[in-house]
């Protein structure tokens, strides 16, 4: 087998650009910068907010309510 064909696998520091958190891992890259980590991601922190805009189900329910109301008046 050939020797020295694989990149060096070393200890690197991962730094979060959002909160500044850093931790150690191993990689072939010299350093890793991430946008969001588990310390500041809304899913992991429990600060997740759901943005509920009128979706297709809500639109259907509104139309269905109107049609049942108009059918009840027609009888």
From Swiss-Prot:
The keyword Transferase appears for this protein: no
Residues spanning the membrane: none
GO cellular component, one term: ribosome
Domain of life of the source: Bacteria
Annotated GO biological process: translation
PROSITE patterns in alphabetical order: RIBOSOMAL_L31
S-S bridge residues: none
UniProt entry keywords in alphabetical sequence: Ribonucleoprotein, Ribosomal protein, RNA-binding, rRNA-binding
MF annotations from Gene Ontology: rRNA binding; structural constituent of ribosome
Physiological role: Binds the 23S rRNA.
Family named by the database record: Belongs to the bacterial ribosomal protein bL31 family. Type A subfamily.
Record's subunit section: Part of the 50S ribosomal subunit.
Protein name, per record: Large ribosomal subunit protein bL31
The organism's taxonomic lineage, starting at the top: Bacteria, Pseudomonadati, Chlorobiota, Chlorobiia, Chlorobiales
């Amino acid at each position: 087998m050939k020797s020295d064909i694989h990149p060096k696998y070393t200890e690197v520091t991962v730094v979060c650009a959002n909160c500044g958190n850093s931790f150690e891992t191993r990689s072939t890259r010299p350093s890793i910068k991430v946008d969001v980590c588990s310390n500041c991601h809304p899913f992991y922190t429990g600060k997740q907010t759901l943005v509920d805009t009128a979706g297709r189900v809500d639109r259907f329910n509104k139309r269905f309510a109107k049609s049942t109301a108009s059918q009840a008046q027609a009888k």
